[in-house]
Amino acid sequence: MSGQPKVLRSVALCHSPQWRFLTLAMLRELKRKYGTAVHVYVFSDQGLKFYAKHAEPGLIDSIQVCALISDGAQRPFTGDRGALEAEARRIEQRYGVTYNEIMMTDRHIGRGFSLLAPNFPRSLQSEATDYSGVLQKFNADFAFWESEFREKRLDTMIFPQKIPGVVARTLGVPTRNLSRTRIGNLFHWAENGEFIELPRLQAVMANVPRGQPPVELATYSQYDTNRKIAIANFGWLRALRNSADWTVKFAMHRATGRSSGYQWWSSIRHYFGLPAQWREVRRLPLGTLADLQGSPFVFFAMQEEPEMSLSWQSPESWPQIAYLWQIARDLPAGVKLAVKEHIYAIGRRPHGFYRHLTDFKNVVLLDPLLPGADVVRAAGAIATITSTAGFEGAWIGKPVISLSRHSLYNFLDHVRLPDLEPGGMRAVLDDIFSGRIDLAKAAEDGARFHRALAGVSFDIGSYNMNKPSSLEPERLDEMLKSFEASFESASEPARE
């Protein structure tokens, strides 16, 4: 057994189904190399069955079922409401976060925060949960996780949910999330599970020499696959098939006494809302890059809602519609705002939303099927909360208006974070379109940033979550080395 790093004495894993075989293999290596105490948290009996079947005796030191944020919040509260609220405020003060911010991260009980997704399917959780139930559940969750961290002396947590991520931050316990780098098939180990950041990246970039080749933008393969699947759902026949499949599944769940989660009618309405809203979009005068030729423009990349990268990683950000309105208001004369919808968001938006966008005289609604990378190349600047377009713009030296305080590229000189005070957005736009950003330096810095990000990443190869044999040994070794290296230059202290 090798010398045991402090951060690997006792490791907790919050079960992530898509990475289950990969993380199981990783836990085996940690146990073999360091004798790490392994504590696993699953969110259903199905998770328990997985480890009972695939984990050998002695690998896992403890395993237990715990609830996701919205699970159990439907239990009626019958106690002293004043005491309940006082305890909630005490916990908020201790951890420096409001319960409402945590609620945002759940697509069920936090659906009210997704202002541009009123047509997202409703669920049993969203409809049967009241505010007191949320307070009761969160009070219990914070007590549970603080007890777990202390009693099991956890040194690191992998894939934390939001509440354990907040507790880990407060107790000084490092966390790691496997996060897509957005370069080819690369992934990296993100820090700070509360917001999923990578603070060491700036120091890594400082060691990347100048003179890196310009970045050639390319769409990663999974995006193309997902895009084809989304477009296939825009047909009426597919809507009928999806509805039939859902009805059978819903009936089987009811017959066996299981919860079906989403409401039957709400899901059916969503399936048929997809082709209906797609046709609503296609009937509008959609812009092309040829229409924008010769006109400087800001590219606003819309994102789907609800979405983890918005509500979890950027809870401080305003709703997308507020930023769109603000930028359209503050643009200099002659500059347009080009808005491109995320293909997954179609069917969720309010009725008439796209038609209303065309009422802005300085806004161009782009064809959603336009390749995003082409729009990034042509734009004068990119405005986004957390979309891939922000990374692409940063890599090729385009000015980026970052609307998230937690984006990995925020430290770059050609990235601007608007001041929240009046005039903040206007000042940023004036900087960009008055030529105050050194575009040659921006392109050089962007290429170095790209190289640094690739340097802390690894390729997971042909891994398929349903095929344990698809995990290649050399890929596992690469991933584990990257995991261990992430602690060497990280900012978090190890628990004593």
Which residue ranges define each predicted feature?
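A donor-sugar binding/catalytic signature common to diverse glycosyltransferases
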Residues: D155-P160, G165, T175, S179-T181, ...
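Conserved N-terminal ligand/cofactor-binding loop architecture of enzyme catalytic domains
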Residues: K33, H39-F138, I183-L274, W278
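Donor nucleotide-activated moiety binding/catalytic core segment of transferases
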Residues: L135-R150, E307, P319, I343-A389
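Active-site donor-nucleotide binding/catalytic segment of nucleotide-sugar enzymes
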Residues: D291-Q326, V335, E341-Y344, R451, ...
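Conserved nucleotide-sugar donor-interacting segment of glycosyltransferase catalytic cores
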Residues: F138-Q202
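Leloir-type glycosyltransferase catalytic cores
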Residues: E197-K249, H414-E496
